[in-house]
């Protein structure tokens, strides 16, 4: 897992670099989902082709929590969809890398997202269309736990179970924080695993920073065709990897200063080196 640890660290470093360069963005929730994206794009879970993003039979990924676009852009760049150097154009005039993903501009982005609550509906519609057409391909959507306060999420959950969309997996980035503070204090969705089960979903829980475990559970969901959509509750830490950002709601949407960036990058590299030595 040493190589994927390196990839996840590279994603986190680039997330911070591009947000610092743009002086705007969402580091907390981007850092919390970096290991999930590493597992999907580099762990052999997603069937995809950077040279042919619209390949027939591909798997589909939707970033429902579109404000974490820096994490998706970093993953796509390192996977080969566009040059890594382009990451530094985040949020700049004329860039393909908008503050939230734009499918008309950025290769590898399946749909424009950022309006919270809509991503799972789009994923469910895609999964339903694939099933009706008898086409290959699994569909994955990454949601925030704060996003699950949106009622549309539960309409999509009900529809997905009713249509037996077992080609659909919803991954919940369960970091416990949103822009205004703790999810449980803003508008608690209660136990999300119990809730998805009540809607007729197959539910699995995983450490959202354990890449081996993530790959195992995501592949298990992908291979399971038992008539139920799949929900993966990934326990994560907002701002993961940077001690002064971890579990701090204030880092939901704030760019680091030059000094903070330097400290964060040094901490991430030191942790990666330690992990490699242990491995």
Language-model features: locations:
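Active-site catalytic microenvironments for nucleophilic, acid-base chemistry
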Residues: 39-44, 78-79, 159
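Anionic-ligand anchoring segments at beta-strand to alpha-helix junctions in alpha/beta enzyme folds, i.e.
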Residues: 83-102
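Alpha-helical support elements that line or immediately flank enzyme active sites
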Residues: 73-82
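Contiguous, well-ordered alpha-helical segments that form the cores/surfaces of helical PPI scaffolds
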Residues: 34-39, 70-74, 121-128
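Generic structural signal for well-ordered, non-membrane alpha-helical segments
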Residues: 1-4, 8, 12, 29-34, ...
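Short amphipathic alpha-helical interaction patches enriched in hydrophobic/aromatic residues
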Residues: 19-23, 76, 200-203
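N-terminal amphipathic, basic-rich helices that act as targeting or association modules
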Residues: 1-69
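Glycine-rich ThDP/TPP pyrophosphate-binding loop and its adjacent helix/strand module
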Residues: 47-54, 58-60, 100-279
